[in-house]
Regions:
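N-terminal Rossmann-like NAD(P) cofactor-binding subdomain of oxidoreductases
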Residues: 2-207, 226
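Charged docking surfaces used in two-component/phosphorelay signaling
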Residues: 184-273
Length: 273
């Protein structure tokens, strides 16, 4: 008989939080018993999001009112610099899955440089597992604290890591061209700019300066046995709400064929359905 797990979601009314709740409600082993919010306590999620028929969900409560003894897992879907405050209070009291950037980077100084904010529990960074399931599956199974990867990094690491592990590509001139819908910027993004008839196009931003570069580099380097990895990262915003694609250009090492590449990805996909 499958186990049922009581699950809490803090920050359940943001874009990430609402999408997470949709996924969790379709999981046969999950019972959502707490939904946290910053500004909508006393309401139901269906009052905020009418894109899905939510059933049997608890009323929204203030994030700080969460009691970790009532749940088996807590997902924290709050912005960076806010999430770590909740983690500090909940650490060692419940299994934590954090969806912010607060625990993805191994080095606090790198975090501070990229996100421009202090960290209330930088000493806990070492206790978090980078939650890229297809790569770190066994580590995740044995960890009580998971840092969910960023959106751009996920789209980049999944294709590149298998190639690095097999030493199929040169590591000095990788070009990454990524495109994202504007939901990735969160609810505070100025949608009116995108919807303007004069701006119905996509555009690049933060070329080679995006804060996800450190996360991408950190995780790629863990699977690279030769020289330091050098890449350019060119992110773009598309004039649509959601979606992401990364096109990556690499130089193949000598004697690596198209079939070699396809076989690597087929094998990777076989074990990561």
């Amino acid at each position: 008989m499958d186990n049922m797990y009581n699950v809490a979601v803090l920050g359940s009314t943001g874009y990430v939080g609402m999408e997470l709740v949709k996924l969790l409600t379709n999981h046969k082993n999950v019972n959502i018993n707490f939904l946290g919010t910053e500004n909508n306590e006393g309401k139901y999620l269906k009052n905020i999001d009418n894109t899905k028929e939510y059933k049997n969900l608890p009323i929204l409560k203030e994030n700080n009112s969460f009691d970790p003894s009532m749940s088996d897992y807590v997902f924290i879907a709050l912005p960076h610099s806010i999430s770590n405050i909740h983690v500090k209070k909940l650490f060692n009291k419940i299994k934590i899955i954090d969806l912010s950037a607060d625990f993805r980077l191994d080095d606090y100084e790198v975090y501070k440089e990229n996100y421009g904010s202090s960290h209330s529990c930088k000493d806990l960074l070492k206790f978090f597992t980078y939650g890229l399931a297809e790569i770190n599956r066994n580590l995740i199974k044995n960890s009580s604290n998971i840092a969910v990867p960023g959106c751009y990094p996920t789209s980049i690491l999944l294709p590149l890591i298998p190639l690095l592990q097999n030493q199929f590509i040169e590591t000095e001139n990788i070009i990454i061209d990524s495109k994202s819908g504007y939901s990735g910027a969160g609810k505070n993004f100025n949608v009116s700019k995108i919807k303007s008839k004069n701006d119905f196009n996509f555009y690049n931003y933060n070329t080679n300066e995006h804060r996800h570069i450190s996360e991408i580099s950190q995780e790629l380097q863990k699977h690279n046995t030769s020289k330091d990895i050098k890449f350019s990262f060119n992110p773009h915003i598309l004039p649509n709400f959601r979606g992401m694609i990364s096109t990556i250009y690499c130089d193949l090492k000598n004697n690596v064929t198209k079939k070699n590449i396809i076989d690597v990805f087929k094998n990777f996909d076989k074990f990561n359905p």
